[in-house]
């Protein structure tokens, strides 16, 4: 959608309760349209199961949590965002000039952390319990990511 911002919440997991089959269609997806250029003052999204896609959003303060599901952030920016998942992968795709300014803290118990080479953070591994962490210092927004069993990907365009 040229000139439109939208937010996609997949509620396809509900189809299992009705059909006994997992199914994702336009009928079981919640899409929130927000006027272009608007910034969310506060965002709180919590799901038990299902994927979350945020596209072209600006969030001042937010928490996004899912127990089981992947999260996709495309061309988003924020001042303070905390992302937490028990089982699911996290993908951040954005512009290099925006992502390089973020203060990022990533912690994962069982999962990989893949970071674009242009980002200048530091990867650390705890050899005793195999935890991975990644830290980047910047002058922009603060991003805190915690996952128990999932991969984290930070990719610049």
Regions found by a protein language model. Give the residues of each.
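Right-handed parallel beta-helix
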Residues: 1-65, 70-73, 129-146, 151-157
